[in-house]
Amino acid sequence: MRKLIFIIAGVLTLTSCKSEFKDNSDRFKVGVFEIPAGKGFVKETIIRKDSIQISQHGDHVDTLSIKWKNSFFYTLKYINPKTALQEDPMYVQINKIHNDSYDFTVKIGFSKFTQKATVHKVK
């Protein structure tokens, strides 16, 4: 009988607890973002709306389609590729979310090339 009371108390405790974690990872699907300049590349400004991403880096402006698989994985593809490399999709995995930024890893096509960086939400 005593064992049954402990089991019931445990079940009630576990089911009555409210999670304090709020998943608002969707906040990175639209807005204005920035990737700071780093070793070998210039600052990049990104504008995301619906299924389009406009990327400005240096004097170059590119338009990409963006397809979200879930809140932590999306695919980018150049709408008007200028090189053979730009014809391959880019697979982006969000690794860690911060207040207004996230760390990600990008893989180009089916190559072994990966790059890690951080995106900051500006607006």
Where do the language-model regions lie?
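Positively charged n-region of N-terminal signal peptides that target proteins for export
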Residues: M1-L4
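C-terminal motif of bacterial Sec signal peptides marking the signal peptidase cleavage site
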Residues: T13-S16
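Bacterial signal peptide processing site
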Residues: K18-E20
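Tryptophan-anchored aromatic micro-motifs
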Residues: S25-G40
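N-terminal glycine/threonine-rich, aromatic-flanked beta-hairpin/loop signature
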Residues: F41-K69
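Hydrophobic/aromatic beta-strand elements that line small-molecule binding cavities or substrate pockets
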Residues: E44-I46, T63-K67, P89-K96, A117-K121
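Short, exposed beta-strand-loop hairpins at the edges of beta-sheets
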Residues: S55, D103-T114
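An anionic, turn-rich surface loop/hairpin at beta-sheet edges
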Residues: T75-N99
